[in-house]
Amino acid sequence: MSQKAIKGYINLIIPAAGATPAPPIGPALGQRKVNIAAFCKDFNDATQGMEKGIPLPTVITVYEDSSFSFKIKTPPAAYFLKKYAKITKGSSSTKKEAVVGKVTMDDCREIAKLKMPDLNTKNIEAATKIICGSAASMGLEVVGN
């Protein structure tokens, strides 16, 4: 059984259960002659059980026959960090210059567990350090052990 020839990949961040033919989805898929309505329906069906509006990084694989498949990744670390810190946006200046909120080390560990499939490590401690680094670059202070 031969595999289909891949025409290209499209990387988008799409809100859960919120795929519409409007930009950026419509133009990105239209350029590659993909059935936009079919993608939107499939994506919305796949994300139906999730909280509406969560940003989901999605990799769409487009094949030569204009068919497609897609892989939904976990929401960005920044989404979880903002949720745990109860803030709407990160600091405009980075690191310790302007602290806009706090997260605990346990929060970072919990986020790391959720993000493990998409991080380039299998070690929970290394994943926690990655999340702590993201928190610091957003202007969040990590408290606790």
Curated annotation (Swiss-Prot):
One of the GO biological process terms? translation
UniProt keyword annotations, A-Z = Methylation, Ribonucleoprotein, Ribosomal protein, RNA-binding, rRNA-binding
In its UniProt record, a GO molecular function of this protein is: structural constituent of ribosome
Keyword presence, RNA-binding? yes
- Extract one GO cellular component term from the record: cytosolic large ribosomal subunit
Does the record's keyword annotation contain Transcription regulation? no
PROSITE patterns recorded: RIBOSOMAL_L11
- Describe its PTM? One or more lysine residues are methylated.
* Assembly with partners or alone: Part of the ribosomal stalk of the 50S ribosomal subunit. Interacts with L10 and the large rRNA to form the base of the stalk. L10 forms an elongated spine to which L12 dimers bind in a sequential fashion forming a multimeric L10(L12)X complex.
Q: Which family does it belong to?
A: Belongs to the universal ribosomal protein uL11 family.
Q: What does this protein's UniProt record list under function?
A: Forms part of the ribosomal stalk which helps the ribosome interact with GTP-bound translation factors.
* PANTHER family found in the cross-reference section: 60S RIBOSOMAL PROTEIN L12, LARGE RIBOSOMAL SUBUNIT PROTEIN UL11M
Name the chain's protein.
Large ribosomal subunit protein uL11
User: Which taxonomic lineage is given here?
Assistant: Bacteria, Pseudomonadati, Pseudomonadota, Alphaproteobacteria, Rickettsiales
**Gene that encodes it:** rplK
